[in-house]
């Protein structure tokens, strides 16, 4: 079961988790610019490659590559048939928890079950992202998202 979250929302949330844990002190904008620079030189330096077995995406504060879902899904599709993977989105889940849970139970061939306590835990509140940074991220993720949409057979509204 795969639960996808809009990559921009995901990295913004992840940034604030790291910041609140005292692991990140730079501004979000600086963090994104620095990672984009690391990605540019990553092919030249093995320690910055995600496929390096020594790469630890938490230690390396890897925000952008962490959300390249198409890359990860392609790996899983080499091991599993597409019908063996249920792909959900965080937006669908938040819009209709009961429907998403029913879909999940059906996929797992389990009887439907009503969950009583469906409130959200650990909900973070963050300042609004700068528009220039959001545009930079939309542009960065667009080709990755387009590849994902082809793999899952549907378009999501993440490229806005």
Predicted regions and their residues:
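PAPS-dependent sulfation machinery
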Residues: 16-61
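Charged, low-complexity, helix-prone segments enriched in Lys/Glu/Asp/Gln
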Residues: 10-18, 34-35, 134, 138-145
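Conserved phosphate-donor/acceptor-positioning beta-strand/loop module used by diverse small-molecule
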Residues: 1-13
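Active-site glycine-rich loop that binds ribose-phosphate moieties when present
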Residues: 71
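Acceptor-substrate binding/catalytic loop of class I
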Residues: 60-68
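Short C-terminal domain-edge/linker segments immediately following a structured domain
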Residues: 4-6, 31-36, 116-120
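The conserved 3'-phosphoadenosine-5'-phosphosulfate
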Residues: 64, 74-147, 153-160
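Short aromatic-enriched loop/helix-cap "lid" or pocket-rim segments at secondary-structure transitions
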Residues: 11-16, 22-23, 98-101
């Amino acid at each position: 079961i795969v639960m996808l979250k809009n990559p921009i929302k995901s990295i913004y949330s992840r940034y604030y988790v790291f910041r609140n844990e005292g692991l990140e002190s730079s501004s979000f904008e600086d963090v994104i610019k620095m990672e984009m620079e690391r990605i540019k030189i990553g092919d030249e330096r093995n320690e910055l490659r995600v496929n390096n077995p020594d790469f630890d995406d938490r230690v390396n504060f890897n925000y952008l590559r962490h959300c390249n879902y198409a890359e990860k899904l392609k790996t899983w599709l080499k091991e599993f048939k597409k019908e063996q993977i249920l792909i959900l989105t965080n937006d669908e889940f938040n819009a209709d928890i009961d429907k998403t849970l029913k879909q999940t139970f059906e996929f797992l061939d389990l009887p439907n079950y009503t969950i009583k306590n469906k409130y959200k835990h650990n909900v973070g509140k963050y300042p609004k992202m700068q528009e220039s940074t959001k545009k930079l991220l939309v542009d960065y993720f667009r080709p990755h998202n387009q590849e994902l949409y082809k793999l899952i057979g549907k378009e999501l509204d993440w490229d806005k």
